[in-house]
Amino acid sequence: MVLIRVLANLLVLQLSYAQKSSELVIGGDECNINEHPFLVALHTARSKRFYCAGTLINQEWVLTAARCDRKNIRIILGVHSKNVPNEDEQMRVPKEKFFCLSSKTYTRWDKDIMLIRLKRPVNDSTHIAPLSLPSSPPSVGSVCRIMGWGTITTTKVTYPDVPHCADINMFDYSVCQKVYRKLPEKSRTLCAGILQGGIDSCKVDNGGPLICNGQIQGIVSWGGYPCAQPHKPALYTNVFDYTDWIQSIIAGNITATCPP
């Protein structure tokens, strides 16, 4: 009985932190192969190494971070293991890339968003399907999901073969303001993480989704380094603030402007 009570208390403590047990594994645990059909990997024609992630939002469009822009991008869809391909994996290249700023620049707290139109639409399959854009902004206190092929250790760079997933908490923007003193008073970014540390998005997770209630609410942008430090949440581009711009571009209004 004592053992059962101890185990129960540990479980409650674990759930209260909204994180999975891991010895400072930044990305959490291996994602279920069927839970991320919208997650895409980016590499270049010269290198097969994944350097960023992105999100399929319909059969012809991918959403990622502006900092993930490169020449000769290759977009891999339906991928789980880098070394054991899925039968339905597909590769695409960009037809067009859209940014909030014509100079393709961004700041650490603003406009870190890139919309990619694929040269050919993808075919939905077991491991390929889009994720919905947000219908409303996320609420403070929400438990949201992050995922990607980013490093899974804090002391050195260790890239996994498969994407890792973890749950983190949505905080008020003021929490990040107190940590990162140069943040402006207002920003189109979201503040999310685990205050106890140990769970975080990190290098190569950039551009990937922050998922709340089954919708993409954020794009991995930046945070403290080393990653997963206590009391240092990360910043995510607030997708809801850019929804009108995204939908206008997809509808054919390529001169649409981002919110100021």
From Swiss-Prot:
InterPro entries: Peptidase_S1_PA, Peptidase_S1_PA_chymotrypsin, Peptidase_S1A, Trypsin_dom
Transmembrane regions listed in the UniProt entry: none
Main subcellular location: secreted
The keyword Glycoprotein belongs to this UniProt entry's keyword annotation: yes
Modification(s) after translation: N-glycosylated. The toxin exists in multiple glycoforms.
Propeptide residues, chain positions: 19-24
Any GO BP annotation: proteolysis
Chain intervals for the UniProt region annotation (Key residues for binding to FVIIIa): 172-186
Keyword annotations from UniProtKB, A to Z: Blood coagulation cascade inhibiting toxin, Disulfide bond, Glycoprotein, Hemostasis impairing toxin, Pharmaceutical, Secreted, Serine protease homolog, Signal, Toxin
Pfam families xrefs: Trypsin (PF00089)
Tissue: Expressed by the venom gland.
GO cellular component: extracellular region; secretory granule
Molecular functions per Gene Ontology: serine-type endopeptidase activity; toxin activity
Localization, UniProt: Secreted
UniProt similarity note: Belongs to the peptidase S1 family. Snake venom subfamily.
Additional information: Negative results: does not hydrolyze fibrinogen, prothrombin, FIX, FX and protein C. It does not induce platelet aggregation or agglutination. It does not bind to platelet phospholipids. It does not bind to factor FXI and FXIa, FXII and FXIIa, kallikrein and thrombin.
Biological role stated in the UniProt entry: This is the first member of the serine protease family that has strong anticoagulant activity and lacks enzymatic activity. It inhibits activities of three blood coagulation complexes: (1) prothrombinase complex (composed of blood coagulation factors Va and Xa (F5 and F10)) (IC(50)=164.1 nM), (2) intrinsic tenase complex (composed of factors VIIIa and IXa (F8 and F9)), and (3) extrinsic tenase complex (composed of tissue factor and factor VIIa (F7)).
Protein's recorded name: Vaa serine proteinase homolog 1
